[in-house]
Regions:
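Conserved beta-hairpin
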Residues: 87-107
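Acyltransferase donor/substrate-recognition loop-hinge adjacent to the catalytic core
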Residues: 36-57, 209, 213-216, 223-239
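Acyl-donor binding region in acyl/amide transferases
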Residues: 3, 87-88, 107-224
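Residue-level detector of beta-propeller blades
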Residues: 11-16, 99, 187, 192
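Short amphipathic alpha-helix that is part of the acyltransferase structural core
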Residues: 42-83
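Class I S-adenosyl-L-methionine-dependent methyltransferase catalytic core
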Residues: 1-51
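Nucleic-acid-interacting cores, centered on viral/eukaryotic replication and modification enzymes
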Residues: 24, 61-65, 98-101
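A short acidic (Asp/Glu
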Residues: 6-11, 73, 102-104, 177-184
Length: 244
């Protein structure tokens, strides 16, 4: 829909063919306004969640999630403005039997060429998020340590049926760098849209596109398999286990 839509009074519907698809606006002289979007299948994950007042223990494991369970957790904990993508496999990060976060791989073909920036082949990190609320400031980084672990690398190689050398992902940010990935991932490239930095967010940006309409689009990459899950947990405890 255009900001200055001369047919706005005749807008009767909006639909999407996929969750990530562009909106299709329908105009008519009559009829009841409707919105039609794809239905997302969800189910509760049968696992306890980490929470406030709890301490991170020492037994860290990976737990493969069903797609429906992943959809539920993503809807519960992730930014609502991030459009759902299709995950090849979603993985829960569990410490002492409690879910502390989730990440997901996509094995879909990509036209991106990262061989000049990082070792290939690569696997795409579609999604990563911690559970909330918690007392730890940087629990999101523990999810990333798990995603980059030797155990995670083996899972990535199993689902892609090829070697997985590096993990790549994309962040949209108001700043030149995302603090979540800083220190673990390196910047592969960065796109800057100066017009978005100057945009009036109260009227120029559609809330449905808010997450993606940031001044910076940053592609990140990091080698996989540099530590085991236990080693990654130990590093996180040493560097990032500060509380709020």
């Amino acid at each position: 829909r255009l900001p200055e839509d001369e047919f706005a009074e005749h807008l009767k519907g909006m639909t999407k063919t996929t969750n990530r698809g562009i909106p299709i606006y329908i105009y008519a002289n009559s009829g009841t306004p409707q919105i039609v979007t794809p239905l997302q299948s969800t189910t509760q994950a049968n696992i306890k969640k980490f929470g406030q007042g709890m301490e991170i223990g020492n037994d860290i494991r990976l737990y493969e999630l069903t797609n429906d369970a992943f959809q539920t957790l993503r809807s519960q904990y992730m930014n609502i403005n991030i459009r759902p993508g299709s995950a090849t496999l979603a993985i829960g990060v569990v410490v002492d039997g409690y879910l502390i976060g989730v990440y997901a791989f996509s094995a879909a073909p990509s036209v991106a060429q990262w061989d000049k920036h990082i070792e290939t082949p690569t696997v795409y990190l579609l999604s990563d998020f911690p559970v909330e609320p918690v007392d730890y400031k940087h629990l999101a980084k523990l999810v990333l340590y798990a995603a980059l672990s030797k155990e995670s690398k083996r899972i990535a190689e199993r689902i892609t049926k090829r070697r997985a050398a590096s993990l790549v992902t994309t962040a949209f940010s108001k700043n030149p760098e995302s603090m979540k990935y800083r220190g673990l991932f390196k910047v592969l490239n960065r796109k800057h849209n100066d017009s978005l930095e100057k945009a009036d967010w109260a009227k120029d940006i559609d809330p449905a596109n808010a997450y993606y309409m940031q001044p910076y689009e940053i592609n990140y990459g990091a080698p996989m398999g540099q530590w085991t899950l236990q080693e990654g947990l130990a590093i996180w405890k040493k560097k990032h286990s500060q509380k709020r």
